Curated annotation (Swiss-Prot):
Record's subunit section: Homotetramer.
EC number(s) given by UniProt: 6.3.4.5
Taxonomy of the source species: Bacteria, Bacillati, Cyanobacteriota, Cyanophyceae, Gomontiellales
Annotated protein name in UniProt: Argininosuccinate synthase
CDD domains in the record: ASS (cd01999)
Protein's pathway: Amino-acid biosynthesis; L-arginine biosynthesis; L-arginine from L-ornithine and carbamoyl phosphate: step 2/3
Length: 401
């Protein structure tokens, strides 16, 4: 008896997920494989991918256009949270996993599948993100992970696929593992496994080399409503169009590259290269607008929430009770985060040069040092005395002979 009768497989068209199809059938006795490819704005023609799944042995090959949901329900929530894992990675790949997991669970219910499957290996974070998200959405649904168990090297996996007529797009001269969606690209493996090796320029697609960027700066005004980006230079765009347009405008100036040593959930360090032009600039601009519209204590407290939030998303806990509780707090903080942020794009730098909001808590009359100054300077002496009283009492007890 096989491990499952009918399986919905998360499918990308790559080597691992393509090999999963014959492997599930011939090694694990699965009777029917349904593949699901999610269109998250990765730029691939999905009809050839759908056809490749059928050619690889799938009975049904599905394509789900999930771009709008991806941006509105996942990316925008992360922007409101200023989510940066280890203060650098904007979770462009990690954010896609809970959405794909939801699509798998929904497809399994629709087609009566008794299991879902993915092509993640046992070393990465994605296996955790898929398995935990699926368990949160349907704890009774079986999850199969062939690549985690088959014990084949990359070369052996390619050879196995070739036995079943599956061509490999990976060339010896380009051994990188690449994941892409509308939010960005992640690149790893091959020469990048040496943390001292400088990445070749050829691995970058969304961002221009600094030497090739324009010699004049470009300015973009990003409009936010309740923490959600809604416009560029005063023109409203749909969520998908806004990200797409901003990616192009930011990337041409060489902005959005990340080269980092990352601490994976499974306990190992990994060298990762990311491109996320729009997402990084939006988080940068959003955080600046918060500094204008939130009180100091809320803003400071939210910083700690943001770190926890980022770890939860990175660690596959998008659907966890704690994540939902943090969502409620973050949404409350965003009610007044509306306004416009002006960003200067030039030679790899995105510099905030202006911000404005009808909800601004900045008072020019209180902040100025000019004649218009309305701050009561005489009040400072009493404030300083009360503020410093605990320190003064401590000093009298400890330092006084």
């Amino acid at each position: 008896m096989g491990r499952a009768k009918k399986v919905v497989l998360a499918y990308s068209g790559g080597v691992d997920t393509s090999v999963c199809i014959p492997y599930l059938k011939h090694e694990w006795g699965v009777e029917e494989v349904i593949t699901l490819a999610a269109d998250l704005g990765q730029g691939d023609e999905l009809e050839p991918i759908r056809q490749k799944a059928l050619n690889s042995g799938a009975e049904i090959s599905l394509v789900a256009d999930a771009k709008d949901s991806f941006i509105k329900e996942y990316a925008f929530a992360a922007i409101q949270a200023n989510a940066l894992y280890e203060n650098r990675y904007p979770l462009s790949t990690a954010l896609a996993r809970p959405l794909i997991a939801k699509l798998l669970v929904d497809a399994a219910a629709e087609y009566g599948a008794d299991a879902v499957a993915h092509g993640c290996t046992g070393k990465g974070n994605d296996q955790v993100r898929f398995d935990v998200s699926i368990a949160a959405l349907n704890p009774n649904l079986k999850v199969l992970a062939p690549a985690r168990e088959w014990g084949m090297s990359r070369e052996q996996t390619i050879a196995y696929g070739e036995r079943y007529g599956i061509p490999s797009p990976v060339k010896k001269s380009s051994p990188y593992s690449i994941d892409r969606n509308l939010l960005g690209r992640s690149i790893e493996a091959g020469p990048l496994e040496d943390p001292w090796t400088e990445p070749l320029e050829e691995i970058y697609v969304m961002t221009q080399a600094i030497a090739d960027t324009p010699n004049s700066p470009e300015y973009v005004e990003i409009g936010f409503e309740r923490g959600i980006p809604v416009s560029l230079d005063g023109v409203a765009f749909s969520p998908v169009d806004l990200i797409d347009r901003l990616n192009q405008r930011v990337g041409i100036h060489g902005i959005g590259r990340i080269d980092m040593i990352e601490n994976r959930l499974v306990g190992i360090k990994s060298r990762e290269i990311y491109e996320a032009p729009a997402l990084l600039v939006l988080i940068h601009a959003h955080r600046d607008l918060e500094s204008l519209t939130l009180t100091g204590d809320v803003s400071q407290y939210k910083r700690g929430i943001e770190e926890t939030y980022s770890k939860l998303v990175y660690n596959g806990l998008w659907y966890s009770p704690l994540k939902e509780a943090l969502d409620a707090f973050i949404q409350q903080t965003q009610q007044r985060v509306s306004g416009t942020v002006r960003v200067k794009l030039f030679k790899g730098n995105a510099t905030i040069v202006g911000r404005k909001s009808a909800n601004s808590l900045y008072s020019p009359d209180l902040a100025t040092y000019g004649a218009e100054d309305q701050f009561d300077h005489k009040a400072a002496e009493g404030f300083i005395y009360v503020w410093g009283l605990p320190t003064r009492v401590w000093s009298q007890q400890v330092r006084t002979p």
